[in-house]
From Swiss-Prot:
Protein name: 5'-3' exonuclease
Native organism taxonomy: Bacteria, Bacillati, Actinomycetota, Actinomycetes, Kitasatosporales
Superkingdom field: Bacteria
Keyword entries, A-Z: DNA-binding, Exonuclease, Hydrolase, Nuclease
Summary of the function given for this chain in its UniProt record: 5'-3' exonuclease acting preferentially on double-stranded DNA.
Enzyme class (EC, first level): hydrolase
GO molecular function: 5'-3' exonuclease activity; 5'-flap endonuclease activity; DNA binding
Gene source species: Streptomyces coelicolor (strain ATCC BAA-471 / A3(2) / M145)
Length: 301
């Protein structure tokens, strides 16, 4: 089981009231919400392996070089020497180090790789997996990894982190008209304002799905642009031609990496805390109470 950690603690932050606080009055709603969510995941699915995948770089330079608008609207501060600072709510930022410390003390593998997003870490673990994979994320970008034949599915939280939608190929075909392999092509054609991806002007989700159904994939659509007999309207042909420079680079930006140099880290689900003393201190300092105890009880069951 692979957790898209940042997307989940964002969901927890907005789904749990900020009246949930540590003894000193510091909000810990994201911390406790995430712990409660992991507890439910482990109870319901009992994964053999669990990895909290992290954004070591939420906006990698190699993606920005190709599409400068990529996530540009979410930059709080540009940092030439390292990853740009991301806009994060003031009361969430201080909770992230607490989340990391608690995961480490629990013994839950926490993996981020310099120069890559959590999506890329997830993509690489998925590519290497020899058995079924559940990807838990609030980011639809990872729908591209869904693969029934390999047992790869997405568990997508709705209503904060209270409910999970199971996304398999049937769900993708019903909602988007594509399978997992086609989702990245659909996304780059249609664009995604939340990630600063412009898409092809005038090609929305339904048109993109129709083009993929007709021509198979992005390469097939691009070949059709140069084929006067292909069933494209003059407007579609014009728009796709004008978007040629974008379409040449967008796949590398949109498709998650599958070749990240992952660390040699144990990923087995822990059955007891790695550092009980550190965990006890964190629980007392941050008032993690029932949330942490419930998760510990579940892990040791």
């Amino acid at each position: 089981m692979l957790l898209d950690t940042a997307s989940l603690y964002f969901r927890a932050y907005f789904g749990v009231p900020d009246s949930v606080k540590a003894p000193d009055g510091t909000p810990v709603n994201a911390v406790r919400g995430l712990l409660d969510f992991i507890d439910r995941l482990v109870k319901d699915h009992r994964p053999e392996h669990l990895v909290a995948c992290m954004d070591a770089d939420w906006r990698p330079h190699w993606r920005v070089e190709l599409i400068p608008s990529y996530k540009a609207h979410r930059v709080a501060e540009e940092r030439p020497a390292g990853p740009d600072a991301e806009e994060v709510p003031d009361t969430l930022s201080p909770q992230v180090p607490v989340i990391e410390a608690v995961l480490d003390a629990l013994g839950i593998a926490r993996v981020g790789v310099a120069g890559y997003e959590a999506d890329d870490v997830i993509g690489t673990y998925t590519a290497r997996a020899t058995g079924p994979v559940d990807i838990v994320t609030g980011d639809r970008d990872l729908y591209q990894l869904v693969d029934d034949a390999r047992g790869v599915r997405v568990l997508y939280p709705v209503k904060g982190v209270g409910t999970l939608n199971l996304v398999d190929e049937a769900a993708l075909r019903e909602k988007y008209g594509v399978d997992g392999a086609g989702y990245a092509d659909l996304a780059l054609l249609r664009g995604d304002p939340s990630d600063g991806l412009p898409g092809v002007p005038g090609i929305g989700e339904k048109t993109a799905a129709k083009l993929l159904a007709e021509f198979g994939d992005l390469a097939g659509i691009q070949a059709a642009v140069d084929d006067p007999k292909a069933r494209l309207t003059p407007t579609q042909r014009k728009r796709l031609t004008e978007a040629g420079p974008y379409l040449a680079v967008a796949p590398k930006v949109v498709r998650v990496a599958a070749d990240v140099p992952l660390p040699d880290t144990g990923t087995a689900l822990p059955h007891g805390p790695r550092d009980a003393a550190a965990l006890e201190a964190l629980a007392a300092r941050w008032g993690l109470g029932g949330s942490l105890q419930r998760l510990l009880t579940t892990l040791t069951a």
